[in-house]
Amino acid sequence: MAAALALVAGVLSGAVLPLWSALPQYKKKITDRCFHHSECYSGCCLMDLDSGGAFCAPRARITMICLPQTKGATNIICPCRMGLTCISKDLMCSRRCHMI
């Protein structure tokens, strides 16, 4: 009985069910305004330095500049698309998406 009450309390508090924005059909499209990378279908909420906000952007393609992961809510540079790895082949150059 206690387990059932804990489950109901978790559902009511939103701890058990995922947020609506986490479901793919509710994710934002490219160019939509965002506050967190998890809101975007691409997984990249890029900072817009001109307007001070952020927008959903596509992930980096092969040989494009990238950052391997997001440490905060928004990205400075988007991570690579699926199947690509964000690495630097030269210590003097920035990271880019490569197939490995």
UniProtKB/Swiss-Prot annotation:
Disulfide bonds join C34-C45, C40-C56, C44-C78, C66-C86, C80-C97. Coiled coil: none annotated. It is found in: Secreted. One of its GO terms (cellular component) is extracellular region. It comes from the Eukaryota. One of its GO terms (molecular function) is enzyme activator activity. InterPro entries: Colipase (IPR001981). One of its GO terms (biological process) is digestion. Residues 1-21 form the signal peptide. Keywords: Disulfide bond, Secreted, Signal. Its main location: secreted. Belongs to the colipase family. This is Colipase-like protein 2. The gene is CLPSL2.
